[in-house]
């Protein structure tokens, strides 16, 4: 059990983190020598100026911070990293009752996102060993499915050690690894060791073929770039025939680490896009960053990226202490628990709303927050989203997902008055009046054909075993001709 950690930034100790066993809470105290530099690593929560800098910074009670000060909790492993940590704990016969958040930070050591490091570290990445990415992907998939019940075979111990090294620090639920790829040969090594010549550092997100997850995220990446959103270069990366999504790290500038804080860390109380803009201004960011927040808001709503929680927005600080909004990341389509329909609830508020955010809400948001060219930005984003089908086809997204996502995007565009197309039709068959004829996807994946026939509401189920089902998927709900509805 670790009771005290040295917290390092760019080879300098910025302070000590200790564990109060009686209060079951951690506290951080600044190194007086570091305070003299005046570099604010947490300007809103733990400023280095004034009386607050001389008093302990106690941990947060909210679950996501695990009893740590918010600006240090960012370095903790997320859901996927915790799965790997649990396996490591079990393999090393460490009782769960003996584990504190400081143990987890010690386990992360120098491998965390951003530039903060924690000493002493339990596991070290002293050499940039070559990685068998095929074995890494196979083991990651098994652990993700079996969780703590996964049994690691003796012959897999080296792969497991590699996965612990490259996989525990990346955030999020999805299995990930931090890798470095040689620019010339394509050779893959651990991305946790600095100083590799002619290598680029990436986050590798293992794809899920059932959900076309890598292909969909790549499609969203391209649409975001076309929308004018700032993102790191990304691409698909094939491993044994399966495609995965890789993106360059924004917390690295060549061999140097950049200090990084998520919105959750830098301002724990913020839960809205209005609050995010306010944080940008408190950090004295340029107005282009505030405009970027608005552009992402519009993209997230219209593209149904509802996983817009406070850990999916970040800020980076250089060694001069200057802050900027980080490039966007984790932009993708979010489905509901049924596995087919779009999830409708956002994580961050827009004008006190998580659902049914409208064009008027966006325009008023821009007016209230001093964002210029709001309508032009909205239309730029809409133009990029109209290209979804063509881009998704190019990246071989499965037809069922193209149909579902295209329908969700079209619904949002129509509700914002950006698309005139109405997917319903009216006609007469054999003397019967058929009005408001339309097809919608149901919760468990079937399609429902709705119509009002001579004033009577009717519903017909098109199951997955029907020949029309595949045709609807291939054509897309937004593109069904009237002849097919007839």
What are these regions (language model features)?
Residues 1-3, 445-449:
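Short, hydrophobic/aromatic-rich segments at coil-to-beta transitions
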Residues 1-310, 314-423:
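Phosphate/dinucleotide-binding and metal-coordinating scaffold of catalytic cores
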Residues 15, 434, 439, 445-446:
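Accessory DNA-engaging acidic/polar modules
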Residues 427, 435, 448-453, 457-460, ...:
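Short linear proline/tyrosine/threonine-rich motifs used for host-factor recruitment
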């Amino acid at each position: 059990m670790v009771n005290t950690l040295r917290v390092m930034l760019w080879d300098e100790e910025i302070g000590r983190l200790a564990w109060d066993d009686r209060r079951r809470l951690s506290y951080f105290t600044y190194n007086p020598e570091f305070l003299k530099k005046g570099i604010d690593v947490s300007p809103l929560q733990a400023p280095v100026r004034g009386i607050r800098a001389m008093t302990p910074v106690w941990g947060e009670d909210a679950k996501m911070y695990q009893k740590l000060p918010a600006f240090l909790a960012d370095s903790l492993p997320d859901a996927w990293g915790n799965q790997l940590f649990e396996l490591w704990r079990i393999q090393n016969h460490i009782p769960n009752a003996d584990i504190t958040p400081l143990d987890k930070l010690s386990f992360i050591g120098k491998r965390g996102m951003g530039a903060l490091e924690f000493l002493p570290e339990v596991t070290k990445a002293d050499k940039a060993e070559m990685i068998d990415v095929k074995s890494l992907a196979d083991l990651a998939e098994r652990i993700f499915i079996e969780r703590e019940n996964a049994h690691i075979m003796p012959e897999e111990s080296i792969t497991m050690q590699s996965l612990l090294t490259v996989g525990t620090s990346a955030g999020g639920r999805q299995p990930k690894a931090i890798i470095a790829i040689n620019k010339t040969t394509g050779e893959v090594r651990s991305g946790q060791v600095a100083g590799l010549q002619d290598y680029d550092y990436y986050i590798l997100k293992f794809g899920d073929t059932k959900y076309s997850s890598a292909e969909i995220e790549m499609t969203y990446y391209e649409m975001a770039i076309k929308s004018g959103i700032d993102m790191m270069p990304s691409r698909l990366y094939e491993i044994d025939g399966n495609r995965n999504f890789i993106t360059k790290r924004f917390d690295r500038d060549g061999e140097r680490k950049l200090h990084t804080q998520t919105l959750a860390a830098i301002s724990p109380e913020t839960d809205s896009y209005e609050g995010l803009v306010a944080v940008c201004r408190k950090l004295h960011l340029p107005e282009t960053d505030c405009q970027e927040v608005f552009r992402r808001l519009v993209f997230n709503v219209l593209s149904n990226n509802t996983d817009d929680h406070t850990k999916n927005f970040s800020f980076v600080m250089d060694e001069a202490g200057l802050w900027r909004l980080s490039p966007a990341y984790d932009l993708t389509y979010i489905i509901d628990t049924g596995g087919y329909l779009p999830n409708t609830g956002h994580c961050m508020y827009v004008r006190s709303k998580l659902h049914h955010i409208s064009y008027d809400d966006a325009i008023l948001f821009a007016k209230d927050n001093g964002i210029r060219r709001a309508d032009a930005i909205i239309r730029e984003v809409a133009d990029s989203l109209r290209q979804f089908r063509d881009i998704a086809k190019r990246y071989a997204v499965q037809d069922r997902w193209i149909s579902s996502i295209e329908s969700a995007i079209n619904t949002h565009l129509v509700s914002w008055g950006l698309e005139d197309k109405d997917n319903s039709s009216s006609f007469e068959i054999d003397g019967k009046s058929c009005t408001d004829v339309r097809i919608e996807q149901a919760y468990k994946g079937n399609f429902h054909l709705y119509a009002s026939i001579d004033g009577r509401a009717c519903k017909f189920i098109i199951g997955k075993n029907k020949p029309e089902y595949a045709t609807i998927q291939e054509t897309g709900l937004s593109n069904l001709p009237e002849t097919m509805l007839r």
